Structure formats: structure tokens, C-alpha cells
Amino acid sequence: MTSLTEIHPALLWETPALRTRAEHLDRAGDHLWRVVDARGRIRGHLRVIADPLGIRYRAERLHLASGSFRLIGEFWDADDAVAALRN
């Protein structure tokens, strides 16, 4: 079975384009970006994952006490994932 990374190798490495200017993305890992608002505050993280049906975007927040990420939601659209981190 062919993985999505083999079909679209550059797709997972590019920074997702956001339609809104309220936040921007700073790379934090291979498939991970920090979501930063206009004031420079980190709202959370956006992780790109491969799904058999296409690219999915996970909105996550770092839980400092445990050192792990907490899933906020998983979306088909990067803007929807970023919007979930605004609240």
C-alpha cells in the first residue's frame, strides 16, 4: 500500500496557508507548527497528519505538567483547526 507521504512528499512539509491574518504559523517540527496570534502569544499547535482520505489538521495544546500534547480537535481545514485554538 502506498502512503500519502510517497504520493505527495512535499505536501506534508509545506506550511499550511491560512485565510485569516489573525494568526500565523511558526514551524515547531516536521509536521508541527505553533499558532501565534498578532500579539505574539502562542495559542496552541497545528499538526498535519496523513489520512487515507487526505490531509488532516489537528489542533493541540501543550500540557506543561505532563509534557504532552492535548488534542483539541481534528479537522479537514487548517483554518478550522486554528479557529478551535482561539477559545
Locate each region found by the language model.
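Negatively charged, low-complexity tracts enriched in Asp/Glu with abundant Ser/Thr
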Residues: 1-39, 65-70
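Well-ordered beta-strand positions in beta-sheet-rich domains
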Residues: 22, 45, 72-74
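A generic structural signal for ordered secondary structure
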Residues: 32, 46, 77-78
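Short aromatic-glycine-(Arg/Gly/Cys) micro-motifs in beta-strand/loop hairpins
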Residues: 43-68
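A short, charged, amphipathic alpha-helix used as a generic interaction element across diverse proteins
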Residues: 63-68, 73-87
